[in-house]
From Swiss-Prot:
The chain crosses the membrane at residues 172-192. This is Apoptosis regulator BAX. A motif (BH3) lies at residues 59-73. Intact BH3 motif is required by BIK, BID, BAK, BAD and BAX for their pro-apoptotic activity and for their interaction with anti-apoptotic members of the Bcl-2 family. GO terms for biological process: apoptotic mitochondrial changes; apoptotic signaling pathway; B cell apoptotic process; establishment or maintenance of transmembrane electrochemical gradient; extrinsic apoptotic signaling pathway in absence of ligand; intrinsic apoptotic signaling pathway; intrinsic apoptotic signaling pathway in response to DNA damage; mitochondrial fragmentation involved in apoptotic process. One of its GO terms (molecular function) is channel activity. PANTHER family: APOPTOSIS REGULATOR BAX, BCL-2 RELATED. GO terms for cellular component: BAX complex; Bcl-2 family protein complex; cytoplasm; cytosol; endoplasmic reticulum; endoplasmic reticulum membrane; mitochondrial outer membrane; mitochondrial permeability transition pore complex.
Length: 192
């Protein structure tokens, strides 16, 4: 958990294919959950419900709890609402690159990337640009493959997320949210 580069802590599958497959399931589930909380059924997403194994369900629950906490942070929501999405690809890749620009990788930033992608998808839903939804998911998975895959493998696969957060206590989640908020403030100030 200290990032010292010791043995992988997650203990999950670490093949590139399995990490990308699990990442896609987690991203899709996270976006469906966020959209569902916005207003019930969202057939416009065009995403089918995919059965998850026990490990993926645990990961999804962890992401949902963190997403709930981020949703309740009004300052973060205000900043996200202010993001201009006229050129969403540029915005997505600028924010994603900025999140990891210092070379420090951690699960909080990976979750922040998923959260940002979900917010862009929800904006696309609200502005009735449904073709953008799969595109944003594709950008997120491309970024994951190109920039984060090796790091996730080094952490022992996606199960490293659970090792990192464990069963998040309110204190852990609050510290995490404060970190994401600080990073997000920096990102959006630079974009402004």
């Amino acid at each position: 958990m200290d990032g010292s580069g010791e043995q992988p802590r997650g203990g999950g599958p670490t093949s590139s294919e399995q990490i990308m497959k699990t990442g896609a399931l987690l991203l899709q589930g996270f976006i469906q959950d966020r959209a569902g909380r916005m207003g019930g059924e969202t057939p416009e997403l065009g995403l089918e419900q995919v059965p998850q194994d026990a490990s993926t369900k645990k990961l999804s629950e962890c992401l949902k709890r963190i997403g709930d906490e981020l949703d309740s942070n009004m300052e973060l929501q205000r900043m996200i609402a202010a993001v201009d999405t006229d050129s969403p690809r540029e915005v997505f890749f600028r924010v994603a690159a900025e999140m990891f620009s210092d070379g420090n990788f951690n699960w909080g930033r990976v979750v922040a990337l998923f959260y940002f992608a979900s917010k862009l998808v929800l904006k696309a839903l609200c502005t009735k640009v449904p073709e953008l939804i799969r595109t944003i998911m594709g950008w997120t998975l491309d970024f994951l493959r190109e920039r984060l895959l090796g790091w996730i493998q080094d952490q022992g696969g996606w199960d490293g997320l659970l090792s990192y957060f464990g069963t998040p206590t309110w204190q852990t989640v609050t510290i995490f949210v404060a970190g994401v908020l600080t990073a997000s403030l920096t990102i959006w100030k630079k974009m402004g």
